[in-house]
Structures are given as structure tokens and as C-alpha cells.
UniProtKB/Swiss-Prot annotation:
This is Protein aardvark. The lineage of its organism: Eukaryota, Amoebozoa, Evosea, Eumycetozoa, Dictyostelia. GO terms for cellular component: adherens junction; basal cortex; cell-cell junction; centrosome; cytoplasm. PANTHER family: ARMADILLO REPEAT-CONTAINING PROTEIN 6. GO terms for biological process: actomyosin structure organization; cell adhesion; cell motility; centrosome localization; culmination involved in sorocarp development; epithelium-like organization; establishment or maintenance of bipolar cell polarity; Golgi localization. The gene is aarA. Residues 310-356 form the F-box domain. Keywords: Cell adhesion, Cell junction, Coiled coil, Cytoplasm, Developmental protein, Repeat. InterPro entries: ARM-like, ARM-type_fold, ARM_LRRK2, Armadillo, F-box-like_dom_sf, F-box_dom. Residues 39-63, 122-166, 256-285 are annotated as: Disordered.
């Protein structure tokens, strides 16, 4: 039995000493961020040199609201008793899920959720297991009597579950003080020295100065936890909190994991004897409890260490575990969080994933804070991506751009490159690229970095590899839409050439194929319409989209999803850009595009973006004479005027509305009269008054008034309604176009003079 428990004792005392040496209980506070970096370790060590080991329990009780782990509760004597309690389960060698819950919830380490702090705190129940006491042998009657006396003394503490957190800690302090009073003063004074001696013996080193190297000690504990995490279950079942809890062991030279099924069967035996890994018979838990004490640990000559004996991760005290978890990488943190609910709650409460995400990928963390699908930065998707980044070979992110902080964007590209046949990974990486390319800050230029890293090619490859995966197609097209999104400058030129890369690499065919494969999927239809809208920027790309059947696909999407405002908006925008080509004007009308645009404008009259794109589409399509007549017959003029009336403060809607009226009124006397009769002149003048410094509104308003002034009655109405004054103001605010405003001003002045005569 001593051989079986020797390595176990050795490891526990090493961690116990480190925990006591750092005095983490003085620094962990829920109201502040946990000290999880290396600098906090050094601060803790420095503080330890200035603080005495005996702390005043009254000071701790006064600070209960700010420090949930007070010194009176976490004294070395209590930790020793916790270790002994958990050692019983280790030596019984029958740990199952139920037994772990029993140890964690019924004995010493009980996680409860505080109603005042909404966090989990550690509570000591001081209740022994009644089932184990009933199964004791007759030779242990004295031990049973002592345990029963302890239970009677602590009944008041265990029965106050509904009391406040402060009262619970006060009772715990009283129990701890009673326990400490029972010990001899000499044992309390020599405790630290004895533990130091035990550590030096158990470590097998002669020079005591080695223990004073805090960094080396921390590295050993860090390695211990990391190796333990490697032996745990992988993350193949992401949505399962705790798939199966089994006892996990670690040794310096080998790893093994004993299942809980056989151990559970052994627990049902009536002989209450258990066998260790090397075949030696182990006594029952109560007999072992009498032998596991400090005096046995000092028996140096009788211990022969078996390096193949293993260590149980579940025995680490919670406060120590909180500190040790901060050293783990993403992969190890995920594996260890699946071992039991206790560790899962610790990782969740202290926000280890969020801190790790923010430290390793700050740009991605910022981009993913504002999204619709990832409810918070520590969702399962973020955990999965962090784990894949952690295991990514360094060759995938070498030589990253200087503007790419820590190469985090290139790492995402590397994860895509390594998992081109994994649709789940591809969808999440495409979604990250979509969020990164959506420029939230002017200084961000992520779309150019993604293009230089070959992100566009990988996105298209993902679409090609998984044509029937709606999630991949949706997020891939969404990423392409943001990567190709750009606005023209004052000269009408675009600075983003990513759309050319998509067209040259066959992106149009893949996008249209996605629309055909997922016709009834609104997410796919929205993002494909969005990217087609951005691709139709010049004559070459417009023709390519039309030849491949893009206009038909867009019209079909608008027909199948009439109540989806996003699809209607992007569809109108795509038809708007495609309508710049003369042949596309005819094809759009043939496919029913005009009717679809007018229906969308009626259905979503209060949505400015849709009205903007609807007016823009009608503007381009109305340059065809047949289309202009079709728009007029279907009350398109009234819808354009309604958009201007409903959104007077939106300069873009006013701009496109005036532009649409220019083409609808061009050399068409009937439309000129209709526009004037429906109040179009007043709406144009109002737009120019409300937006005097918007060049688009001023120029398009001036053009609409000029076409309407071809009608003598309209000309006089414009002059008398303040049109001349507005032209003079526009000349001052926009001197580059002063000649055009002056021309219309003279025409109106002549009409006003003739009208007065």
C-alpha cells in the first residue's frame, strides 16, 4: 500500500507546498479579473516573503465580500484533511461518475452558486460519508465513534444551506479553529519546516536551494497538468458537456486511463477489498484513512517509489487548480474541461476561454464581439478555432505581414488550408473571414491581407469541395461579399480589386451553383445575391454574370423569398448594378425584374436601404424606353416619390430618387405631368433644401428639375417655388458644377419674367 500511494503522496505534497508558498487565497477575488499571468506569480511570491503564515481570521471574515477564499478557510490543516479525504477514493481504485460527484459534493470540495456574486465558491461541508461508516470493519469502531462525534458537532453547519454566504463561512471558520485547537502547539509551529523537509525528500534532491527556485517549481507543476490534459478525452463530441467521467491518471514516464465500468463493478463487491495496479491488496477506505497522515509521509526509509504509479487530477484543490489552468494552451484547456463538471465550471466562471481568445487573437476577438451567430466570444465555435490554431504547424503562419498582429489572420488561413475536407471548420473560418473583412474601423484593412494570404482561393476551394453544405456555401459567399465590397471615390473608381480575383478564378459559376443547390435556403440566397451585386461593377463582370444566368437566379431568389427583406434588398442592388448594361436591361425586364423591384418597394416602404436600391434599379432600367413605359404603367413613379417622402433625411435615398425621376421624365410629357401632379416638384426642391452640401442630391435634383421644366407649366411652378434661389445656393456650395446650376437658373428666371408679364 505504501508503494501504491507513495507517488500519489509525493505529487500532492508538491502541489500543496506550491499552493501554500504562493498564497493564492490572498489574491483571488471575484470582483476583479483573476491574476492569471506570470507577473502575478512573481507578485504572489514577493508577497509571501512579507506575510506571516498565521493570519488573523477576523480580518478575513470582514473581507468576505471581496475575497471568497479567506485564510482561515484555506489553512494548511484543512488542505491536509482534504487531501486525506480524496486519497481514500484514490486507494479504493473504484472512482466512477457517481463517486466523483459524492467526493466533490458531499465531502470537502463543494461547488455552489452564490446568489450574491453569481459565481461558484468552494464550501466545506465537514460531513463524512455515512455509507462508508456503515461498512467499516469491527476493528475500526474507535475511528467510527470519532467520525460520528465530528458529524454531531458539525450538523448545524451542514443544515444551514439556505443561510447567507457570510454565515456559512463564519461557521466554517469556527470549525477550523476547533480543529486547530486540538493540535499541539509544537506541531503547528513546526508544520512548515516539516513540509519543506518532506518535499526535499520526496523530490529526491539533496540541495534545498532547488526548492527556492519558483520558476522551476512552476514549470514542473505546469508540465504535470499539461501531461494530465493530454491523457484526457478529445473534443470529438463538442456539444456534450461531460460525455463520460473516468478516472484519469498520469505518471512521469507513461500515461494510462482506467475506465469507470470495471471499477464500478469492483465497488459492488461485498468484501470491501480492492487491488492496486501492481496487484497488491489494498485495505478498505477507513483502514487507509488511519494510515494516511503526516507521520506516514515522514517514513523515509520505508518508501520505495514506483514511477509507474499514477496521479489523479481530481485531487487538486480548487484554488490551486484555478491558478494552474491559466498556464494551459487551448487544446489542453479543452481536454481538461471535459473531465468533470467541477473543472468545466471553473473554466467557465473565471472566463479562461475569453482571456485566451483575447490574448492570442485580439483582432479576431474584437471582430467576433459584434456578431449575430456567436452569442459570446467563448462559444463553442471560438473554442474549436482556438484548439485548431493551437495545433497548427508553424509552417502555415511563417512570414506573416507586419500589419497582421502575431500572424492571427494567417493562422486562420492556415487552419482552412489544413482542413479543406472538414465542412464544420471551413464554415467557421469563412465566418471569421467574413467578420474580419467587414471593416468596423477605418484603420483595418483585413480584406487586403486575406487576399494576399490566398484567402479568396481557399474560400472558392471550400465551396467547390462542399457544394451541398448550406453552411459552407452561406458563410463562404458572405466572406466573398465583404471581401469584394467597396465604394467608388469621387472619380467613380474602385480601390478594391478583389472582385476581379473572384471572377478570374471561376467564382461566378460556384456562386450560381450554390443558388441552384439551395434555392429555399434564405441564408445562401441572401449572401449569393450580395456577392453578385458586388461583382457586377464593370462591363466585363456584368456580362459574365448575365451570361452565366445570374439575372435569372436573382429573380428566382426574389420570387421564392418575397418576405425576406435582406434578399429583396440585395436582389434590388444586384439588378441595379446589372442594369447598367444595355442588354441586361432587356433581360431583367424579360425575367420580371421590374415587377419584383416594385413589389419589394411596396412591401418594405419604411426600409431606407431597400428603397435606395429599388430607386437605383429603376433609375438604370428606365433608360430603356420600353422599361420606362412598363415602370410608369405599374405606378413606379408613385413608388419613387413615396420613397422620397418617407425618407426625407436620408440623402442617398433622395439622390437615387431624383436620379430615377430624371430618366422617367426624359422626353416623356405624360410622365412630366404625372410627376408634377403627384407632388414631385416640391419633393425635389425639399430634398435640395434639406441637403445643400450633398453634391449628389444637388446635381440629381437639378437634373430632374431641368427635365421637368420642359413643360412650360412645370417651369413656372419651379421658378415660383424657389428654384432660382436654390440654384444660386448650389453654385456657392458646389463651384465645380456652377455652370450647370447657372444654366438652369437663367432658364427659370426667364420663365418667371414671362409669367409675370
Amino acid at each position: 500500500m505504501n508503494d501504491c500511494g507513495s507517488l500519489f503522496n509525493k505529487k500532492l505534497f508538491k502541489m500543496n507546498l506550491l499552493f501554500k508558498h504562493l498564497k493564492l487565497q490572498q489574491h483571488l477575488k471575484l470582483q476583479q479579473k483573476p491574476l492569471l499571468n506570470n507577473s502575478s506569480i512573481n507578485n504572489n511570491i514577493n508577497n509571501n516573503n512579507n506575510n506571516n503564515n498565521n493570519n488573523n481570521s477576523n480580518n478575513d471574515s470582514n473581507n468576505t465580500n471581496t475575497n471568497i477564499f479567506n485564510n482561515s478557510f484555506l489553512n494548511s490543516d484543512l488542505i491536509e484533511r482534504l487531501i486525506i479525504k480524496f486519497t481514500i477514493g484514490y486507494l479504493k481504485n473504484n472512482i466512477t461518475e457517481d463517486y466523483i460527484e459524492q467526493i466533490l459534493l458531499e465531502n470537502q470540495n463543494n461547488f455552489i452558486k452564490s446568489t450574491t456574486t453569481s459565481n461558484y465558491i468552494l464550501e466545506e461541508n465537514n460531513n463524512n460519508n455515512n455509507n462508508n461508516n456503515n461498512n467499516n470493519n469491527n476493528n475500526n469502531n474507535n475511528n467510527n465513534n470519532n467520525n460520528n462525534n465530528n458529524n454531531n458537532n458539525n450538523n448545524n453547519n451542514s443544515s444551514s444551506s439556505s443561510s447567507s454566504i457570510l454565515s456559512k463561512f463564519n461557521k466554517l471558520e469556527e470549525d477550523n479553529e476547533l480543529e486547530l485547537q486540538k493540535k499541539q502547539k509544537q506541531q503547528l509551529e513546526q508544520q512548515e519546516e516539516e513540509l519543506f523537509n518532506q518535499f526535499n525528500f520526496l523530490e529526491g534532491i539533496e540541495d534545498q536551494n532547488d526548492f527556492l527556485s519558483e520558476q522551476e517549481t512552476i514549470q514542473k507543476i505546469k508540465f504535470l497538468i499539461k501531461m494530465t490534459a493530454k491523457s484526457m478525452s478529445n473534443y470529438s463530441s463538442p456539444n456534450t458537456l461531460i460525455p463520460s467521467v473516468s478516472k484519469t491518471y498520469i505518471s512521469p514516464f507513461g500515461l494510462s486511463s482506467n475506465g469507470s465500468t470495471n471499477n464500478h463493478n469492483n465497488n459492488n463487491n461485498n468484501n470491501h477489498h480492492h487491488h492496486s495496479n501492481n496487484g497488491n491488496l489494498i485495505e478498505s477506505s477507513n483502514n487507509v484513512n488511519n494510515q494516511l497522515n503526516v507521520s506516514n509521509y515522514n517514513n523515509n526509509n520505508s518508501n520505495h517509489y514506483d514511477e509507474n504509479n499514477q496521479f489523479d487530477i481530481f485531487l487538486i484543490p480548487t484554488e490551486m487548480l484555478v491558478h494552474l489552468l491559466s498556464f494551459l494552451s487551448a487544446n489542453d484547456l479543452w481536454r481538461i474541461s471535459l473531465t468533470c463538471k467541477r473543472i468545466w465550471y471553473i473554466v467557465d466562471v473565471f472566463k479562461f476561454w475569453e482571456l485566451l481568445f483575447e490574448q492570442t487573437c485580439p483582432r479576431i476577438y474584437y471582430a467576433m464581439q459584434f456578431n449575430s451567430r456567436w452569442s459570446n466570444p467563448t462559444s463553442f465555435q471560438s473554442k474549436m478555432i482556438l484548439c485548431y490554431i493551437d495545433r497548427l504547424p508553424t509552417d502555415n503562419y511563417k512570414n506573416f505581414d507586419k500589419s497582421d498582429e502575431s500572424g492571427q489572420i494567417k493562422k486562420i488561413i492556415g487552419v482552412m488550408n489544413e482542413n479543406l475536407h472538414n465542412p464544420m471548420i471551413l464554415r467557421e473560418t469563412c465566418y471569421i473571414l467574413k467578420r474580419l473583412s467587414y471593416r468596423q474601423r477605418k484603420e483595418d484593412e483585413h480584406e487586403s491581407l486575406i487576399a494576399r494570404y490566398g484567402g479568396i482561393s481557399l474560400i472558392l476551394q471550400a465551396m467547390k469541395n462542399h457544394p451541398y453544405d448550406a453552411g459552407v456555401q452561406e458563410d463562404a459567399c458572405g466572406a466573398l461579399g465583404n471581401l469584394t465590397c467597396d465604394s467608388p471615390n469621387n472619380m467613380g473608381l474602385y480601390s478594391n480589386d478583389n472582385y476581379l480575383s473572384v471572377v478570374e478564378q471561376g467564382g461566378i459559376q460556384l456562386i450560381l451553383q450554390a443558388m441552384k443547390n439551395h434555392m429555399m435556403n434564405p441564408g445562401v440566397q441572401y449572401n449569393t445575391s450580395f456577392v453578385l451585386r458586388n461583382l457586377a461593377r464593370n462591363d466585363v463582370s456584368e456580362s459574365r454574370v448575365a451570361i452565366e444566368g445570374g439575372i435569372q437566379s436573382i429573380a428566382t431568389a426574389m420570387k421564392n423569398h418575397p418576405n425576406h427583406i435582406g434578399i429583396q434588398t440585395q436582389g434590388c442592388g444586384a439588378l441595379r448594378n446589372l442594369g447598367c448594361n444595355d442588354s441586361n436591361k432587356v433581360l431583367s425586364a424579360k425575367e420580371g425584374g421590374i415587377g419584383l423591384i416594385l413589389r419589394a418597394m411596396r412591401s418594405f416602404s419604411s426600409h431606407p436601404d431597400l428603397q435606395l436600391n429599388g430607386c437605383g434599379a429603376l433609375r438604370n432600367l428606365a433608360r430603356n424606353e420600353d422599361n420606362k413605359n412598363m415602370i410608369s404603367r405599374q405606378n413606379g413613379i408613385q413608388l419613387v416619390l413615396g420613397a422620397m417622402s418617407n425618407h426625407p433625411d436620408d440623402p442617398d435615398v433622395q439622390d437615387e430618387g431624383c436620379a430615377a425621376l430624371i430618366n422617367l421624365a426624359y422626353q416623356d410629357e405624360a410622365n412630366e405631368e404625372t410627376i408634377a401632379r403627384e407632388g414631385g416638384i416640391n419633393l425635389i426642391l425639399k430634398a435640395m433644401r434639406n441637403h445643400p452640401f450633398h453634391s449628389g442630391v444637388q446635381m440629381q435634383g437639378r437634373g430632374a428639375l431641368k427635365n421637368l421644366s420642359c413643360n412650360p407649366k412645370n417651369k413656372l411652378t419651379i421658378a415660383r417655388s424657389g428654384g432660382i434661389e436654390l440654384m444660386n445656393i448650389a453654385m456657392q456650395n458646389h463651384p465645380n458644377f456652377a455652370n450647370r446650376f447657372l444654366e438652369l437658373s437663367r432658364i427659370l428666371q426667364v420663365a418667371l419674367e414671362d409669367g409675370n408679364i
